[in-house]
Amino acid sequence: MAEGNSDYDHRAMKLQRNLRHCEGKRLELERELFQHSSSDAHICHLKYMKLKNSLKEVCERGKKAHLRNQAFLQEFDLIEARLFGLISNANALQKKKMQLKSHPPEMNKGPNMSRSTYHPATIFMGRQMSASSSIEHCLTQRKSPQPTKSFSISDPHSVRQAAMNRNVTDSCVVPANSDIQCLNKPDKIDGNTSFQLSQKMPVTSVASSEDGRTHRAQIDKSQSGRKHLVESKQSAQLSTQILERLSPENRARDLQNDSPGNMVEKSLMYERLVPNEESFTHANPSGASPDACDYINNQTSDKHSARENLSETIESHLIPEEEDKQCLDSSSDLTVSISESEDDSYPPCEVNRIEVNQNDEKNLYTALPKQETVILKNYEQSSVIQPLQTSEVNSCDESSSASTISQSNLSDEGFFHLLQSIERMVLLREQGGMELYQRAGINQKQLLRLISVCNRMGALRVEDLEACCALVLCKTQELLKSTFVGYSHEATAGIHNTDESKERFLSRKCQERLLGHIAFLNKHHILNEKVLPECFTSVMMLSDGQNSCKSVENVENSTEDGNVPQVSSTMKDDPLTIKPRQIVQELYKTTGSSHQEFETQVHPGVVLQSANISVESNTQAEEENDEDEISDLSEIYIPGLTVEEGNATTKASKKQISETSFSSSEKSPISRKEDKNIQPNYMKSNNMSTGNKFSKVVTTVKSKAFWGESEDSSSEIEAMLRPKTESVDDFDDFFD
């Protein structure tokens, strides 16, 4: 136990000694640390580090400030440049202002003043003149009470007079106060004052030293003193008005008032101030040659006669509204600009009004009062032309392209262009589900626009595809209806080969183009057998009928030699052959009602007389054809053919044919009219030959196939038996 306690004590004491030693070292280190921290070197080092950090922050702030100052400098440079520009402009404006203040414009220095200062528009008999000449007249006004300036018309072709047979020419007398209004005293013709319409033509001033014609337009000595006094007063008043208008503050207002409409009104007001109760004539001046005056009168008479014939050859087209408001050239001589051109067309409503005036053998514009003449002039410039509505269908021949085409009628070339444009638009819009040719109705305004574009071969828009299809249907219905009416007249009245009958039928070229268009639509799956317009069906039926008629015609030509009688009889009795009567009936069914509705839409209020005529002629044709089918065909003798139980055999002699034909010609007129329409079917089918060949085929059949040419029969008998191809009615009236 004692040994254990001694070891413990020994270790505890050792630990205490180590603890004292460590504590002494700690105190010594603390003392050294305190001394070091309180030394100057440590304090300087701390200050150094602090200053170094401060310097770094100052450098960063300096860089940012430098960038900001650079941006400010750039902005200041731009502002400075702008200010310099404004200052320079202000200096230039200030200099101009000082020049204007120091040198004000003086307008009354003399006749040699600058022409470029001011050009107020003046008017003389509805014509515009340059202002410089008017100012010169105004300046010379103070020297003489009534100075005049004469003018000669340089272009005699462009002169328009109020009457055709007037031997006195109007002299252009310009008073000195012509800055606002200059008028010519009107001639007195049968108590009616005429207001002359004017047109553009140059007027040159005649020098006083040239040919002694300076005073050729002076006031007539026979004029009353009262009228002269009134003109003097008006001249003095207008002279003062000119001087007031030349002031700078009134220039803007004068420029606004110098419009063509205001000029016409002012000229009318000024003309009312001058009493026109006393008639006077302008004597032929001594300086002017009478031949020149006669030449001018002849030219104006020709222009007036051409104006009277305008209503017969007028074509409706749009008149562009163009007004020349430019100032006259300062270096040019005195010129006259006239309000209208003589070649402008009139609207249809004005054409009717002009024709009424022509029945009274008066001038187109002389017969009207002055107020109505001004209204007529303004209407010609601003009115919209209404299209001429025509009920006739244009000819489908190629020669019709050279003739003038009405605006409301589609030509063949325009129709072909329309079909080609539709096909091109269909190819561009190659999509499924396009529904075209579903409606035939179209707005009248849109119809006229499309017709105008097609006639001019213009480009059509894709948006108008449905409207173009409707126009094709309408045009096809018109052609089919005209063809149907032509066939009806051929069947009833026996019209032969004339120009009028040729224009009725659908040309072969149009028909082939329509068939090609139908094939194109079928190829692109736009139309099929189930969905097909009635007019397209009629065109296809008409084409099939004409093809069958061609084959029958070829067979008939071969029967003249007696080679193929069997084939002709089979063609005649073939139930599949389309007869002309059937085609006409189908055409009427498909085109009659639809075309009547179309014309009611396009031309409301117009009575469709042609449709009624076609219905009556169709009824007559059906009755006659029914009688023809019921009648016995065995009584008809045809050269080389005999109809017996559906078989055809050749006859033994041709002399018997001529004898039977002669005996049949001695019937009564009534029976002759009935027998005239009795023909075999293969001969009736010739009536459906294409287009312009229709009348030619009928004439050939009657002259050769039916009557024949025999060597045994005499020429006189054949001449009596042969029917007249020129006029069937005269042949019938001979037996009445």
Curated annotation (Swiss-Prot):
UniProt entry tagged with the keyword Cell wall biogenesis/degradation: no
A single Gene Ontology CC term: cell projection
Biased composition (Polar residues): 192-208, 328-339, 678-690
GO biological process, one term: spindle organization
UniProt biased composition (Low complexity): 658-668
Entry keyword annotation includes Lipid metabolism: no
Chain intervals for the UniProt region annotation (Disordered): 192-238, 279-305, 323-348, 642-690
Subcellular locations according to the entry: Cytoplasm, Cytoskeleton, Microtubule organizing center, Centrosome; Cytoplasm, Cytoskeleton, Cilium basal body
Listed InterPro entries: Centrosomal_kizuma
UniProt feature coiled coil, ranges: 10-35
Sorted UniProt keywords: Cell projection, Coiled coil, Cytoplasm, Cytoskeleton
Function of the protein: Centrosomal protein required for establishing a robust mitotic centrosome architecture that can endure the forces that converge on the centrosomes during spindle formation. Required for stabilizing the expanded pericentriolar material around the centriole.
Family label: Belongs to the kizuna family.
Name by which UniProt lists this protein: Centrosomal protein kizuna
Source species taxonomy: Eukaryota, Metazoa, Chordata, Craniata, Vertebrata
